[in-house]
Amino acid sequence: MSKVASAAGKAIDWASVASKLKLDAATASAIANFRSRHAQAVAKLGTLREQATTVDFATYRSVLANKEIVNRIESSMKSFKPVKIDLNSQLKAINAFEAKASEGAKKNVELVKAELQNLSATLKNIEQARPTEEITIEDMKQAVPEIEKIVETMVTKGKWVIPGYREKFGDLSIM
């Protein structure tokens, strides 16, 4: 991994990525799983690089009585060719994960854009709203026509308290 990529990976606050980007649980857990597998692979690579890769066959010949075994092992090691592994299946899995992550990211982008539009419309409504002191009874009747019938019914029945008001807001009367 390049120094730039390593520095960029260390600069990211991975704990807050999911909450800041509002990722769904599946995407967040997939990222966490990928990060843990990557950390394990980097640790394993570090331990393997620290190990010695050369074998001193002269030492084994001097210690062991059966020198033919040492000669066979040495010839086997010299003729050893590492097996080339076909990485296509793993690359396909990585590409599938990347496609799924991209699709999830696009959905998240659309959700965020829709939420931003909704919030900006709400903010515009709040900024353009009239102060409550300027709202008249006629404005209330026009906005909610059934309020006039409700008030007339309450007045004819002699009810001056809105049902449920005291339970919700408490009794503010002095007496």
UniProtKB/Swiss-Prot annotation:
GO process annotations (BP): proton motive force-driven ATP synthesis; proton motive force-driven mitochondrial ATP synthesis
Modified residues (N-acetylserine): 2
Keywords attached to this entry: Acetylation, ATP synthesis, CF(0), Hydrogen ion transport, Ion transport, Membrane, Mitochondrion, Mitochondrion inner membrane, Transport
Taxonomic superkingdom: Eukaryota
Membrane-topology descriptor: Peripheral membrane protein
Pfam families reported in the protein's UniProt record: Mt_ATP-synt_D
GO molecular function: proton transmembrane transporter activity; structural molecule activity
Cellular component annotations (GO), alphabetically ordered: matrix side of mitochondrial inner membrane; mitochondrion; proton-transporting ATP synthase complex
Compartmental location: Mitochondrion inner membrane
InterPro entries found in the cross-reference section: ATP_synth_F0_dsu_mt, ATP_synth_F0_dsu_sf_mt
Main localization category: mitochondrion
Membrane-spanning residues: none
Family in the record: Belongs to the ATPase d subunit family.
Purpose: Mitochondrial membrane ATP synthase (F(1)F(0) ATP synthase or Complex V) produces ATP from ADP in the presence of a proton gradient across the membrane which is generated by electron transport complexes of the respiratory chain. F-type ATPases consist of two structural domains, F(1) - containing the extramembraneous catalytic core, and F(0) - containing the membrane proton channel, linked together by a central stalk and a peripheral stalk. During catalysis, ATP synthesis in the catalytic domain of F(1) is coupled via a rotary mechanism of the central stalk subunits to proton translocation.
Name listed for the protein in its UniProt record: ATP synthase subunit d, mitochondrial
Organism per entry: Schizosaccharomyces pombe (strain 972 / ATCC 24843)
